[in-house]
Regions:
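Low-complexity, acidic/polar, glycine-enriched regions of mature
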Residues: 2-232
Length: 232
């Protein structure tokens, strides 16, 4: 009887230790996922100059550092026990080209390297790449223009305007047609465009594993800001 009681005490003690260890990991996990991350912000038109080049021509995405530099990424809500917080990730690893003829945007493609998107937590970045976005299998996301867009009315005086673009957005290997209004700014030799594109991750086949302490909301945003210059 004594031996049996001793075994029960040992088993009970081990169970308590395991439970306490798991409880101790919960705040650690929350701290890893609950930071706001790194978001791609909108256009900063402060100090913008009048356009110094014609809008027609071949334009390419530039990744030169500085104000309104090219960036793309995501923003989603993380659903924590009793709380809801936003988390963003971004990258400057973006390529793209656009063609404007007679004041009409006739062709355009933008490619984002998903494997280089970062938040502000290395552990979270690794989990997002491997377990959510599966970047080894789907390393790129793209937007391809499918309808011409009138850009002839964009202001030339260094103030921002808007342009509506329609195209195929492909994430996780799955394309969806979207129509989105972009803010656009002609300043000096550059054109800057920005939008926060609402998406439902399930439309792109992006599932999330069953996290212990947090889940990711279905609805979120693709944040994109492109700095374009004339093709040399």
């Amino acid at each position: 009887m004594r031996t049996r009681n001793q075994k029960l005490i040992v088993i009970g003690g081990v169970a308590v230790i395991v439970v306490l260890a798991l409880l101790a990991l919960v705040p650690l996990f929350i701290s890893l996922v609950s930071h706001p991350g790194v978001k791609t912000d909108g256009i900063d038109a402060d100090g913008a100059k009048a356009a110094s080049t014609d809008v027609d021509g071949e334009w390419v995405v530039t990744t030169k550092p500085g104000k309104n530099m090219t960036s793309a990424g995501f923003t989603f809500y993380e659903l924590l026990p009793g709380d809801e917080r936003t988390t963003s990730g971004s990258t400057q690893d973006v390529e793209g080209e656009m063609t404007i003829e007679g004041g009409s945007l006739t062709a355009g493609k933008v490619t984002v390297n998903m494997g280089n998107i970062v938040t502000d937590k290395d552990v979270r970045d690794e989990n997002v790449r491997r377990k959510i976005l599966h970047t080894e299998e789907y390393p790129e996301s793209t937007f391809v223009l499918t309808e011409p867009a009138d850009v002839s009315q964009l202001p030339e005086d260094g103030t921002a305007g808007t342009v509506t673009l329609t195209g195929d957005l492909t994430i996780h290997g799955k394309p969806n047609s979207i129509t989105q209004e972009f803010n656009a700014l002609r300043t000096g030799d550059n054109v800057i465009v920005h939008a926060d594109v609402p998406i439902n991750r399930l439309d792109y086949g992006v599932e999330t594993p069953e996290f212990v302490a947090a889940k990711i909301a279905e609805d979120g945003e693709i944040n994109i800001r492109l700095k374009l210059e004339k093709k040399s």
